[in-house]
Curated annotation (Swiss-Prot):
Its EC number is 3.6.5.5. Residues 743-830 are annotated as: Disordered. One of its GO terms (molecular function) is microtubule binding. GTP binds at residues 40-48, 207-213, 238-241. Microtubule-associated force-producing protein involved in producing microtubule bundles and able to bind and hydrolyze GTP. Most probably involved in vesicular trafficking processes, in particular endocytosis. Required for coelomocyte endocytosis. Involved in apoptotic cell phagocytosis. Required for recruitment of phosphatidylinositol 3-kinase piki-1 to phagosomes. May play a role in rab-5 recruitment to cell-corpses-containing phagosomes but not to endosomes. Required for embryonic and larval development. Residues 237-240 are annotated as: G5 motif. Keywords: Cytoplasm, Cytoplasmic vesicle, Cytoskeleton, Endocytosis, GTP-binding, Hydrolase, Membrane, Microtubule, Motor protein, Nucleotide-binding, Phagocytosis. Residues 653-744 form the GED domain. Residues 760-801, 811-830 have a biased composition (Pro residues). This is Dynamin. It catalyses: GTP + H2O = GDP + phosphate + H(+). Pfam families: Dynamin_M, Dynamin_N, GED, PH. It comes from Caenorhabditis elegans.
Length: 830
């Protein structure tokens, strides 16, 4: 280790300490820490590679999925040999069989004993004089078939877990593949290629080289000539199952691995660049350089995270949950803010707070007053036939046995009072709708106090209870308004038509229908949802005018599809299909004739119920009224009554009809005007005044204000989590600041390139050996240091040399020469 730059070697422990800073504080790392993730299929040899690094058997083994949680393995060079788990900090494991047992127990504690998996990692630190500083993440092996209680999508779950690690640009990928399988079908390389298509972050590891079929070898792969990776491949030979069962010593296995490569004719020329020891050195160097490159970005990310949290942390820094003064101040602030939020919701928001997605608060109440309430009133009107029949009965019953010569005004009063009484139901329904909407506003504004759930619940209870009291008062007052209209029939009203004008209209047969002119009432998107009309629901642009309904392909209104005259058209609600989110209504002719081609009704709908109500209110303005539910009567009796009316009675019926229509317009106009005013004054405004003047007093009357200001467990956890994250970031920045920044300023060694270039000018450039003869086999490498010896690690090999042809020896970390000049076996400085 004397040839290594100690400042650079400190980088791996720095990242380990940063990782621990987050883990110890119970905070997940939301930053992309530099690391190496070990990826491979089941039985690819991942565990054996890691055990060879440590020199001990310490990982669980068995059939199926053995690694069921990510294992963050931190190898730390130390004179003593022991292991330590982060979840058992301070407890040293010197028996590595106990380490294996602890991994199994900790895995089962989270995932259960039936092969379940979890993304929550286990942190294990191994101290040993036989390891280089290195951090790896052992991930579950890729599998195809679920076992035990594993879900059917276990393959996708493992794949997603692996991708969460290797998707990060700061993560190097150690792709472990058995050499006795087809590399083209390697799960590890395939997954690595998805996230690293250029092979810049992937290091290939070939295992089971000793198990390849006779006459085959992996020379071209190890020389990076097939499936090239910028960081190349390293071959290793692990213990077989027989060796593991026989408890073969790992040191003996490493010696056997070395002998295998030296003696094998296909690998002996590159034996110095194969094996577990070389792989460990390579990973140490590449991870060190990788950390060096990413550390400034990590520092910036930590600083940004801290700056984003500073405002909230400053609020929490001196936080005392049981301080009475703080509780009183918080209570006053919460109530004041609640009142302001209610007022803003009802009266309207500022430009900064206005919602652009949907109507809310006061806007919804406004729509109830001016769209929904008029629609409910019109729904209560009876149709012409029903009204004329009632007028006829009233006139006959008033005349009795006598033959009436004049139109009786008592018939007008009886019919008008019946119609006025019917206005009470929609008026009270308007109150219910507004109260429900106001309750929603109160609930939404109270949700801002979720930090104090008892205060929120108590405040909401007090305000809603008061609002319900005001609701009853409002309903009584609205009932009185209707009673006022019933108490006195003001036939001298300036807008009332009078008997003389009514009789004139009756004699002329004029229609009482108001002429709106050919004006546009509403435009918007609706779906034509007749199943047989179009295939599925299709949105069209509809334009409603006072006498017709047209629809177009789009809102440019260039391509008109159809225009439907509204004369005689009725409207009815229809239910949507099963699991349908569409609200629908239909247009039809009461006499049953087709409304469009062969279809007797036109079904229109959209997903928003409020939009449907607005459309139905617009149709009312155009004179399209809802379908009435009539009692079934005997047709013969109805025909007899219809044919028995004489011309004089018919004129009297028409006169009363015109009088009732004129008077009801006056009353309806009054009701439409007074009911919203009564609701606003008696409910909305009075509730607002109550909250400003009396709400705080009612809260103090509840008794224990300390209990009201008890913080929710969720909020406490949120605060603690933020403080943990803040302190973890602060600690991580402190750790990073200890790194010698001049070391970080050095130029890192170059990545492997696809061609060979001699070193730049220097005191002693490295000579380029002659390329191997085409198709021939290179002679065995001479001893290290002799003529023709391979360049030391960190120097580029010739194209024909092992690891050449697009590869390179793994780069060394930069060094500073000591007083005596460059260390041995190192290239002179550039």
């Amino acid at each position: 280790m004397s040839w290594q730059n100690q400042g650079m070697q400190a980088l791996i422990p720095v990242i380990n300490r940063v990782q621990d800073a987050f883990s110890q504080l119970g905070t997940s790392v939301s930053f992309e820490l530099p690391q190496i993730a070990v990826v491979g299929g089941q039985s690819a040899g991942k565990s054996s590679v890691l055990e060879n690094f440590v020199g001990k058997d310490f990982l669980p083994r068995g059939s199926g999925i053995v690694t069921r949680r990510p294992l963050i393995l931190q190898l730390i060079q130390d004179r003593n040999e022991y292991a330590e788990f982060l979840h058992k900090k301070g407890h040293r494991f010197v028996d590595f069989d106990a380490v294996r047992k602890e991994i199994e127990d900790e895995t089962d504690r989270v995932t259960g004993q039936n092969k379940g998996i979890s993304p929550h990692p286990i942190n294990l630190r191994v101290f040993s004089p036989n390891v280089l500083n290195l951090t790896l993440i052992d991930l579950p092996g890729l599998t195809k078939v679920p076992v035990g209680d594993q879900p059917a999508d276990i393959e996708q779950q493992i794949r997603d877990m692996i991708l969460t690690f290797i998707n990060r640009e700061t993560c190097l990928i150690l792709a472990v593949t058995p050499a006795n399988s087809d590399l083209a079908t390697s799960d590890a390389l395939k997954l690595a290629k998805e996230v690293d298509p250029q092979g810049l972050r992937t290091i290939g590891v070939l295992t089971k080289l000793d198990l390849m079929d006779e006459g085959t070898d992996a020379r071209e792969i190890l020389e990076n000539k097939l499936f090239t990776l910028r960081r190349g491949y390293v071959g290793v030979v692990n213990r077989g199952q027989k060796d593991i069962v026989g408890r073969k010593d790992i040191r003996a296995a490493l010696d056997a691995e070395r002998k295998f490569f030296i003696s094998h004719p296909s690998y002996r020329h590159m034996a110095d660049r194969l094996g577990t020891s070389y792989l460990q050195h390579t990973l140490n160097q590449q991870l060190t350089n990788h950390i060096r490159d990413t550390l400034p970005t990590l520092r910036d990310s930590l600083q940004k995270k801290m700056f984003a949290m500073e405002k909230d942390v400053a609020e929490y820094k001196n936080y005392q949950p049981n301080d009475p003064g703080r509780k009183t101040k918080a209570l006053l602030q919460m109530v004041t803010q609640f009142n302001a939020d209610i007022e803003r919701s009802i009266e309207g928001s500022s430009a900064k707070l206005v919602s652009t997605n949907e109507l809310s608060g006061g806007a919804r109440i406004n729509r109830l007053f001016h769209e929904r309430f008029p629609f409910e009133i019109v729904k209560m009107e009876i149709d012409e036939k029903e009204m004329r029949k009632e007028i006829q009965y009233a006139i006959r019953n008033i005349h009795g046995i006598r033959v009436g010569l004049f139109t009786p005004d008592m018939a007008f009063e009886a019919i008008a009072k019946k119609q006025i009484t019917r206005l009470k139901e929609p008026s009270l329904k308007c109150v219910d709708l507004v109260v429900n909407e106001l309750a929603n506003v109160i609930r939404q504004c109270a949700d801002t106090m979720a930090r104090y759930p008892r205060l929120r619940d108590e405040l909401e209870r007090i305000v809603v209870s008061h609002m319900r009291e005001r609701e009853q008062i409002a309903k009584q007052q609205i009932g009185l308004i209707v009673d006022y209209e019933l108490a006195y029939m003001n036939t001298n009203h300036e807008d009332f038509i009078g008997f003389s004008n009514a009789e004139a209209k009756a004699s002329q047969g004029q229609s009482a229908k108001k002429n709106l002119g050919n004006q546009v009432i509403r435009k918007g998107w609706l779906s034509l949802s007749n199943v047989s009309f179009v295939r599925g629901s299709k949105d069209n642009w509809f334009v409603l005018m006072s006498d017709s309904l047209s629809w177009y392909k789009d809102d440019e209104e260039k391509e008109k599809k159809y225009m439907l005259p509204l004369d005689g058209v009725k409207l009815k609600d229809i239910e949507g299909g099963f699991m349908s989110r569409n609200h629908k209504f239909a247009l039809f002719y009461p006499d049953g004739k087709n409304i469009y081609k062969d279809y007797k009704q036109l079904e229109l709908g959209c997903t928003n119920l409020d939009e449907i109500d607005a459309w139905k209110a617009s149709f009312l303005r155009a004179g399209v009224y809802p379908e009435k539910q009539k009692a079934q009567e005997d047709e013969s009796q109805q025909e007899m009554e219809d044919t028995s009316i004489d011309p004089q009675l018919e004129r009297q019926v028409e006169t009363i009809r015109n009088l009732v229509d004129s008077y009801m317009r006056i009353i309806t106009k009054t009701i439409k005007d007074l009911v919203p005013k009564a609701v606003m004054h008696l409910i909305v405004n009075q509730t607002g005044e109550f909250m400003k003047d009396e709400l705080l007093a009612h809260l103090y009357q509840c008794g224990d204000t300390d209990a009201l200001m008890e913080e929710s467990q969720i909020e406490a956890q949120k605060r603690e989590e933020m403080l943990r994250m803040y302190h973890a970031c602060k600690e991580a920045l402190r750790i990073i600041s200890e790194v010698n920044m001049s070391t970080l300023g050095d130029q890192p060694p170059p990545l492997p390139m696809s061609d060979y270039r001699p070193h730049p000018s220097g005191p002693s450039p490295v000579p380029r050996p002659a390329p191997a003869p085409p198709g021939g086999r290179q002679a065995p490498m001479p001893p290290r240091g002799g003529p023709g010896a391979p360049p030391p690690p960190g120097m580029r090999p010739p194209p024909g040399a092992p690891g050449g042809g697009g590869g390179m020896y793994p780069p060394l970390i930069p060094t500073r020469p000591g007083p005596g000049g460059p260390p041995p076996n190192m290239a002179p400085p550039r």
